[in-house]
Amino acid sequence: MKNIEEHLVEGHMKVTLWGGQDWFVIVDAKIDTGADRSSLDIALIEALEFLPARKSRKVRSANGVTTRDLYEVSIEWDARPHRLLVSGADRSRMRYPMILGREDFLDLCEISEEE
């Protein structure tokens, strides 16, 4: 297992996303310490059949402040299952289909280091 510093130096990490029909995909997630929470490409959300969490969040981006739907996402990282609440966004033109925000990244690392 890599420690927090190694992931931050690399700036990204592999995350397995588990979908509604036990489908999964491994994505390269960008660690973004400037983002509070995580975001996932809406095409992946639809393909993996993630359901909306019936919540939304105001998100500040380069395009201004928008309201995005939130989705409960099942992931596997460091050989352990986790659940994240992510916002959906069109990331089709971006290098990374997932942004792992600071709070979620620290939560994942904290859980891994406790075990």
Predicted regions and their residues:
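Pepsin/retropepsin-fold aspartyl endopeptidases
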Residues: 1-115
